[in-house]
Amino acid sequence: FGPAILQDAMYCISAGTAHTPQLGFAAILKAVNDGDYDFVEVVSEYGRRAKVMKQIFLDNGFQLVYDRDEDQELADGFYFTISYPGMSGEELLSELISYGISAITLDTTGSTRHAGLRICVSHATDERLADLKSRIQLFSHAQI
């Protein structure tokens, strides 16, 4: 875990970055370690929203592309991956865009699975979840 944090996460977000953001990031890490900042509380909103969004897709014929990490179920978080039977990622994205839903295809993320999309949770506010549900339902009914 240590090398992954240092060599993969820390390096990627700080290498080539100006000094001020590095100091800001260091201050956040210090506050977390000192118990002054509860980052879990802040990011738990993404998990709650992802759970609702995932269910909207699943209730309308979509499937999760990545639902497990080895033998453990994936937690809900910043994004999740979905597919729709019989459609490539590009076909699905093209269709969903016509319903006002954007995403990115899995092949652009480096995934070995290409029949699916990555759905970002951060841009979907609670106020927009009803719109998402109605648009996904419209899409689903059009596929029948």
Feature map (PLM): residue ranges:
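Soluble or luminal CAZymes and related metallo-dependent hydrolases
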Residues: T17, D38, E45-R49, S88, ...
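PLP-dependent enzyme catalytic core of the Aspartate aminotransferase-like
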Residues: E95-S102, T109-I144
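Conserved glycine-rich beta-strand-loop-beta hairpin in the small C-terminal domain of fold type I
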Residues: F39-K54, L64-S83
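Conserved core segment of the aminotransferase class I/II
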Residues: F1-S44
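A short linear hydrophobic-aromatic micro-motif
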Residues: L64-R68, S102-D107
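Short beta-strand-to-loop capping motifs
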Residues: I82-G86, V121-H123
